[in-house]
């Protein structure tokens, strides 16, 4: 005897499988975008550190040469 719910169950499973496949594709895209954002953030962090080091160097040089002035 055939299970009366078999067709309904197989349809539900097919929908679940389709939804999981779409979810996996979305997660892959999200991971790619996060990698891209992280790369840009690393570049921004490096640039920020370079600017901070430059500012500290200029500040040190101005103090060493006694040419540092108070802000206006």
Curated annotation (Swiss-Prot):
Residues 18-53 form a coiled coil. It holds the Pfam family DASH_Dad4. It is found in: Nucleus; Cytoplasm, Cytoskeleton, Spindle; Chromosome, Centromere, Kinetochore. Keywords: Cell cycle, Cell division, Centromere, Chromosome, Chromosome partition, Coiled coil, Cytoplasm, Cytoskeleton, Kinetochore, Microtubule, Mitosis, Nucleus. One of its GO terms (cellular component) is DASH complex. Its main location: nucleus. Signal peptide: none annotated. One of its GO terms (biological process) is protein transport along microtubule to mitotic spindle pole body. InterPro entries: DASH_Dad4. Belongs to the DASH complex DAD4 family. Component of the DASH complex that connects microtubules with kinetochores and couples microtubule depolymerisation to chromosome movement; it is involved in retrieving kinetochores to the spindle poles before their re-orientation on the spindle in early mitosis and allows microtubule depolymerization to pull chromosomes apart and resist detachment during anaphase. Component of the DASH complex consisting of ASK1, DAD1, DAD2, DAD3, DAD4, DAM1, DUO1, HSK3, SPC19 and SPC34, with a stoichiometry of one copy of each subunit per complex. Multiple DASH complexes oligomerize to form a ring that encircles spindle microtubules and organizes the rod-like NDC80 complexes of the outer kinetochore. DASH complex oligomerization strengthens microtubule attachments. On cytoplasmic microtubules, DASH complexes appear to form patches instead of rings. This is DASH complex subunit DAD4. It comes from Kluyveromyces lactis (strain ATCC 8585 / CBS 2359 / DSM 70799 / NBRC 1267 / NRRL Y-1140 / WM37) (Yeast). The gene is DAD4.
């Amino acid at each position: 005897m055939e299970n009366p719910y078999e067709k309904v169950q197989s349809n539900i499973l097919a929908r679940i499988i389709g939804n999981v496949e779409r979810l996996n594709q979305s997660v892959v895209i999200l991971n790619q975008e996060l990698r891209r954002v992280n790369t840009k953030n690393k570049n921004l962090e490096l640039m920020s550190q370079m600017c901070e080091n430059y500012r500290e160097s200029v500040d040190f040089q101005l103090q060493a040469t006694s040419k540092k002035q108070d802000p206006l």
